[in-house]
């Protein structure tokens, strides 16, 4: 027999053990076989399991507490680093602001000396009483002295000159502001030399054309002919002051060397072009077409690298950020599509994000001189300002009830000018978002601030009753 249940115990007692051994009844308190010598606590095995579970839970809680303490310490370290970075950035911004203030003060001092010298020279002139005096200086305007900014622009005059015999479509300064070009529906690009001091200088290597300019510091130097249709947009190289690209409805992009007055390259895009832009390093060009294609052109070889088709999106304008890392496209959906530029990749571009902000088609966009902000003008009459790093809209400017056609930042980033189909150009102070000055004119197709001076060039529409000149430059002080 294997075992038998003892009536006086809850335990099985082996019955075949040796006589005289150490087996005994549990109730007698004698030494028992090691198998039965363990004193079980109240509750038996369930109590042991509960103790083990409690110990495991305590260990897990301790581990979680340690992890939380570690995370809190890491977060504290990150916040401390961010705080130090913010302090460094604020210090750098303060230093840059002081440097800018010193520069502006030196400029004001120089202008004051020049003005004093001019007044002394003209004091004996009989005609000096007929010369309007403008005393407001261009400086760093803030929300506390907006009246001075308004007064400054109200004292400015406009100088105009005639070149295009048909509608002007685009106007652009070269990188150093020594040349200004305009394009027209007649398929001709016209280039003028520009000297802010009034010293005109013709290009002896080009076929000069006569100028009807009313001032002596802008003089037409050359006509560039080669397109078979209207030229919709022109763009200067940011690295070469004599290279110019033109986008025509004849389905080609032309690269011009203004110094010799000749086309040095032609690239077919297989569709009517509406916009063209150089990359900041001058190595690439992007062009968008009327049938919503984007052409990427390599400049050293002057060949097309790739043509992209965007279905369902009517492209209106294309552009680069100031670092050349992003290609942005404005479309008829009121959105801006941001693409990462990958020059060494076979695809060359990768979609990053869509910027939603307008209820109607976006016609124009432009980066500020620092590259921090992007302005976009829309058919909903709103100009939006975007922080390109965060890709968030941070500010808006209300132009009017008319669609915005062109936007441009001043050289120092203080002001933004916006034109529309109506007969005005509005100048806004960016920091305060306030309108500062209105330029009365016919509808403007294109405008652009000078790269180093507070001068605004624009191409007015031709009015049948009052034909405007091809190009006007606003911002002169007497």
From Swiss-Prot:
Composition-biased stretches (Polar residues): 126-140
Gene3D superfamilies: YVTN repeat-like/Quinoprotein amine dehydrogenase
Pfam families: Beta-prop_THOC3
Transmembrane segments: none
The keyword Transmembrane helix appears for this protein: no
WD repeat residues: 163-202, 226-268, 270-307, 310-349, 357-396, 399-438, 440-478
Compositional bias per record (Low complexity), positions renumbered to this chain: 106-125
PANTHER family hit by this protein: THO COMPLEX SUBUNIT 3 (PTHR22839:SF0), THO COMPLEX SUBUNIT 3 THO3 (PTHR22839)
Name of this chain's protein: WD repeat-containing protein AAC3
